[in-house]
Regions:
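Extended, non-catalytic scaffold segments that flank or surround catalytic motifs
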Residues: 81, 175-178, 201
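GST-like fold's C-terminal all-alpha helical module
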Residues: 92, 100, 104-188, 193-195
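Short, solvent-exposed turn/loop segments enriched in Gly/Ser/Thr/Pro and often Arg
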Residues: 13, 152, 199
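GST-like domain detector, emphasizing the conserved glutathione-binding G-site
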Residues: 1-137
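A generic membrane alpha-helix/interface feature
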Residues: 48, 167, 172, 207-209
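Acidic/histidine-enriched, glycine/proline-rich intrinsically disordered or flexible terminal extensions
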Residues: 199-210
Length: 210
């Protein structure tokens, strides 16, 4: 359980793609003096239920503020710690980024629960993930797709790409190569390595050890 002396506490599961995304944003922002209250899969927390009526993770607590939607959390962190900015200033670009993030949240993130389900459900989710990522990668140019600066869009996509090998999701060679090169640059960032839970690090132990 996190120390009460910390000004910020993040309730997080060690194999939750949403929690990973929030931890990555916090590490990219260099947030100091925050604690992680780890919950294992299936573990419930009375403290969390008192704070969050949905009893969901990630949940961020900063003094009297409790935030429990991952998108709201990362946008709050981006505004609370303005440097480096993780969203463009231009309102049109911001809208485009938000739409891209929304599509990942709606289309890709929910598939991870199915990937942990029965073999039949997991196979269907794997095929759907492959289909969606192949479409994304078909015209993929990282700097065209995500802009010139590292952003919340990268932070949303990185936890997805990290889990593909673990869940045996493969893409056609041409599209897979494009995403793999981009993913390697994401995974090489020091903040990404720091964002990994022990469970997540074991998904790709050789890469996490580098």
């Amino acid at each position: 359980m996190a120390s009460r002396r910390s000004s910020m506490t993040l309730y997080s599961r060690d194999n939750c793609v949403h929690s990973h995304r929030v931890r990555l944003v916090m590490e990219e922002k260099g947030v100091a003096n925050y604690e992680i209250a780890w919950l294992r899969d299936g573990e419930e927390s009375e403290d969390l239920l008192d704070l969050n009526p949905y009893n969901s993770v990630p949940t961020l607590v900063e003094r009297e503020l409790v935030v429990y939607d991952p998108r709201i959390i990362v946008e709050y962190i981006d505004e609370r710690y303005p440097h480096p900015p993780l969203m463009p200033v231009d309102p049109v670009l911001r809208a485009q980024y938000r739409l891209a993030i929304y599509r990942m949240e709606c289309d890709l993130y929910p598939l991870f629960e199915d990937l942990e389900s029965t073999p039949a459900v997991a196979r269907k989710a794997r095929n759907r993930m492959t289909e969606l990522l192949t479409t994304l990668a078909a015209d993929f140019s990282p700097r065209q797709y995500i802009g010139e600066e590292f952003s919340l869009l990268d932070c949303t996509l990185a936890p997805i790409l990290w889990r593909l090998e673990h869940h045996e999701v493969t893409l056609p060679s041409k599209q897979g190569e494009r995403l793999a090169k981009y993913a390697a640059r994401l995974f090489a960032r020091p903040a990404f390595e720091r964002s990994l839970s022990p469970v997540e690090a074991e998904m790709r132990p050789a890469m996490a050890a580098n």
